[in-house]
């Protein structure tokens, strides 16, 4: 009811999908994921033909093809050899099942450098591109991808406190709220602001003069001493999220999402 294709990596999942598709009166397409080295999801290559053959016999599913995922858990870089392995496995599954398995999904944004180099095998006919489109990054090194923008998403927080305070805590210190041991450099008195945001991982201030110092569960502490644009209580501060920051903000019910349509 919600999707035409599902990426799967186990027979048990396929069986449950087949039962659900039967109850819904539809024939659902699945893409069998194969692990070619990144060690995230996927059946091991030497079991791919066997698993696809089993799934192909389920009554309410169509095995649309094979897929893989790279540069995710293990950071393994896509290569021509790994893509050729996937295409070869597709051909073997075709022979074993008699099904066309037309879709061969070679990976995600990490495959773009291989594609741009002209080394992508012709049998790869699908990529699942996300970060490179939305954030404009080459995910292998996070450098800007040619022809894209890196400011398409901004996380905006409001300043709820602005005080000049010491740069080193006063008193004995232990772990912070998240179990980390913090280290501080004495920079004298600094103008510090608190934003109504949570942990600072994976965000970068748009203003290069603003520095993220740390956070509690719902307070982001920033140094605005050298901010290019003066701030005050009630001011908005803008941040550029990376993939992790965008994921957290997108899934949080406490973050309002606004599409501005700006050029």
Residue ranges and their predicted role:
Residues 83-263:
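Active-site anion/phosphate-binding pocket segments in diverse small-molecule metabolic enzymes
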Residues 1-81, 88, 92, 96:
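Active-site-proximal beta-alpha core segment in soluble small-molecule metabolic enzymes
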């Amino acid at each position: 009811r919600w999707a035409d294709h599902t990426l799967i990596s186990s027979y048990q999942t396929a069986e449950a999908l087949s039962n659900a598709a039967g109850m819904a009166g539809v024939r659902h397409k699945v893409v069998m994921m194969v692990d070619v080295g990144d060690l995230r999801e996927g059946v091991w290559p030497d079991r791919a033909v066997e698993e696809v053959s089993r799934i192909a016999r389920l009554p309410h599913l169509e095995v649309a093809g094979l897929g893989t995922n790279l540069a995710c858990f293990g950071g393994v870089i896509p290569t021509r050899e790994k893509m050729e392995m996937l295409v070869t496995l597709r051909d073997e599954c075709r022979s074993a099942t008699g099904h066309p398995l037309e879709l061969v999904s070679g990976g995600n944004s990490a495959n773009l450098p291989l594609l741009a180099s002209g080394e992508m095998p012709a049998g790869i006919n699908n990529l699942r591109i996300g970060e490179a489109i939305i954030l404009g990054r080459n995910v292998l090194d996070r450098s800007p991808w040619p022809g894209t923008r890196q400011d398409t998403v901004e996380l905006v927080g409001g300043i709820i406190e602005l005080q000049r305070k010491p740069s080193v805590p006063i008193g004995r210190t232990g772990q912070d709220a998240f179990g980390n041991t913090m280290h501080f450099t004495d920079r004298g008195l600094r103008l510090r602001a608190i934003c109504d945001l949570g942990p600072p991982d994976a965000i970068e201030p748009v203003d290069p003069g603003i520095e993220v110092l740390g956070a509690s569960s719902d307070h982001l502490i920033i140094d605005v001493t050298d901010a290019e644009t003066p701030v005050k209580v009630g001011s908005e501060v803008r941040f550029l999220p990376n993939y992790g920051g965008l994921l957290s903000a997108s899934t949080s019910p406490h973050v309002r999402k606004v599409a501005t349509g700006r050029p």
